[in-house]
Amino acid sequence: ILFFVLIPLVLTFTLWLPHTATPGTGASTGTWFHWVKVYSALIGCVGFMLIRYNKEWSSNKYALLFPPIILSVNILEACIRDFQVYGLHATGQVIDGVVMMSGPWNIMNGIAGILNILAISGWMGIFISKDENQDMLWPDMLWYWIIAYDIWNFAYVYNCVSDHAFYAGAALLVSCTIPAFFIRKGAWLQHRAHTLALWMMFTMSVPAFVNSPRWGVPASHNPQALFAVSFVALLANIMVITYHIWKIFKFKRNPLKKEVNIDEPAYMDVAREKNCFD
């Protein structure tokens, strides 16, 4: 509550609006995307806490729709921004405080993000761990979807805020993907929401950090690199959605009613914990 409700409310009116993220001033943190992103991430954190610590919510099939909906909204926000940047027809100008390069990579990556949304499944199988952490675990969200998401998200940051790609892209993604693979399998979305919300709060409070000579990691803004990264993102998500659709039809699993990946070892590794307590 302190980190994801009280502090953001105080920062909104004492720092962000009047000083560091004022809309319409040309600041990189003053765009619609940054404001929507920080609050959608915070809403995700609060919603996940309600599911984790309220038994009625964690067992309510309608409440379990919240995680895929807020995840889809977050992805869609970035897709819209990618398409918007394409429409700017930028060729290296500073727009909204960052260097912009528009091109087909924006369209490719926007499509990749939409495919990533379509491959989300199995939210009805979300459950809360019985240990003291009470983690929100999603067995059907497997490693290959997470990798496809990471590639897409890095491509988005590289396309739309290139000079922030090291921190907001690579470092931020690794911070939740490594735990999901090696520490707490199944809890990726919970970790993603927390790390994203904290990063957005930090960057809106100290926007100069990523552009400072000491800490900044500037991008090359090379059109070939932009194209290559978005091409890989699109290819990865085409592969994931193709496999997803194949499984749906082969095993006759309606993704709106049941989990799709119940035969996967990675699914079983997470679901086994639920079965131990059922």
Predicted segment positions?
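Juxtamembrane "helix-exit" motif on the non-cytosolic side of transmembrane helices
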Residues: T14-G24, C79-G87, W152-S162, A208-V217
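C-terminal transmembrane-bundle signature of multipass membrane proteins
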Residues: A168-F277
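An N-terminal, globular interaction/scaffold subdomain
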Residues: I1-N60
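Hydrophobic cores of alpha-helical transmembrane segments in multi-pass inner/ER membrane proteins
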Residues: K37-R52, N109-G125, L172-T177, V229-H244
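Membrane-interface segments at the starts/ends of alpha-helical transmembrane spans
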Residues: G24-T31, T91-N106, W215-V229
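Central hydrophobic cores of alpha-helical transmembrane segments
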Residues: F3-P8, L64-I70, R192-M204
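Generic multipass alpha-helical transmembrane bundles of integral membrane proteins
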Residues: S59-A187
